A protein has these predicted regions:
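Charge-dense, helix-prone N-terminal extensions
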Residues: 1-122
Length: 122
């Protein structure tokens, strides 16, 4: 869902009730792990920028919750941990078919790795 919300707080008020808790948890983890990043709304969803470049984002899409980890080294290091039923992923996108499929420990690990990464952004 491409939101027109100008702030993440407003965005979270728009999302479907069954996804709200998971999206709030994603935001909490992003804010804790990505110190020094700017929280913005980009591409219709919450995004986290460093030096003007979006490195992480998430969104409630029509059929899934999308988590966007845009550091290629971080995605590559976590691919095996993402190979679970109900989760699909590509170059920088992770798609969770249901909120309960999100392994927040893996997400936290990816966010911490993003904070430390100097790798390429896809």
């Amino acid at each position: 869902m491409q939101s027109q919300a100008k702030a993440v707080t407003a965005y979270l008020k728009e999302v479907p009730a069954e996804r709200k808790a998971a999206l709030k948890k994603l935001r909490q983890l992003c804010r804790a792990a990505l110190t020094g990043f700017e929280e913005t709304m980009e591409y219709g969803g919450p995004s986290y920028k460093r030096n003007g470049v979006v490195e992480v984002g998430f969104a409630s899409q029509k059929n899934f919750i999308g988590l966007y980890i845009l550091r290629t080294d971080v995605m590559n290091a976590h691919r095996d941990l993402l190979k679970v039923r109900g989760v699909s992923f590509g170059k920088g996108a992770i798609r969770y078919s249901k909120p309960e499929r999100i392994d927040f420990n893996v997400v936290e690990s990816m966010l911490r790795a993003t904070h430390e990464s100097t790798g390429e952004v896809c």
